[in-house]
Regions:
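PRPP-associated nucleotide enzymes
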Residues: 5-238
Length: 238
């Protein structure tokens, strides 16, 4: 069977998005293109420090773009010489990530939103019945504040199937319902975007990415992608 073209993939994404906005920050050329090229390049990938730093840089730039969508209110700041009126963000931001690949990406967001609270989860799917028909979430570790009425940013570098993002979302929201959710990824696959659309609140979620690649392979890796982000950041695992 012929694989869908990249054009058809993007057309499909635009068709399914409806209320949920999908923003690819690489649609306009910027220094993000350079960071993405280095992340993908198998020769650059040998340098873990450079790889982590580029993931962090993309997180910083994506955080800046997200900051343009926040609510702002007028505040007065006193300088040594007088007073200055300025517009400051009024959102109460929670930066969340899923261990382990998300840590450098999370750091980039925290560098920008340095007053934000952080949330972390380590979770995986498990069957809750003997027939293996009902899937639940086993949370090994969860640290999160009350999310009620707050702006939640879930940063995970690879949005492949969307399963990990859903697990993280369900774990975090046991601590309350956020005002808005920003799903942030370095690279997204159409399958992952569709899964988020099916499992997240459509009118309260925005998907951000630095690239939308064409497909998943049989091992559920994004193609062309970059490989295993966690291994490239921290080394291979057993």
């Amino acid at each position: 069977m012929q694989k869908p073209s990249l054009f058809l993939t993007f057309a499909f994404i635009n068709k399914i998005s409806f209320q949920m906005e999908i923003i690819n920050i690489s649609d306009n050329c910027s220094v993000v293109n350079l960071y993405m090229a280095e992340l993908r390049d198998k020769n650059y990938q040998k340098n873990r420090l450079l790889f982590r730093n580029n993931v962090t840089r993309i997180g910083e730039l994506m955080a800046y773009e997200i900051s343009k969508t926040l609510d702002y209110e007028k505040k007065t700041v006193e300088t040594p010489l007088g007073k200055c009126d300025t517009m400051l963000p009024s959102d109460d931001i929670v930066l969340a990530t899923i261990f382990r690949a998300g840590l450098p990406f999370h750091t980039g967001f925290l560098n920008v939103f340095d007053h934000a609270t952080s949330a972390f989860v380590s979770a995986y799917r498990e069957y809750v019945d003997e027939a293996h028909t009902e899937v639940g979430i086993h949370v090994e570790y969860l640290a999160a504040p009350d999310l009620t009425g707050k702006t939640l940013i879930i940063a995970d570098p690879m949005l492949a199937t969307g399963g990990s993002m859903e697990l993280g979302y369900k774990a975090f929201t046991t601590h309350g319902t956020p005002k808005h959710i920003h799903v942030a990824a370095v690279i997204a696959a159409p399958e992952g975007i569709e899964h988020v659309r099916q499992t997240f609140p459509d009118d309260k979620t925005t998907i951000w990415c630095a690239a939308i690649d064409q497909e998943l392979n049989e091992n559920k890796y994004i193609v062309p992608g970059l490989g295993d982000a966690g291994d490239l950041c921290y080394g291979s695992k057993i």
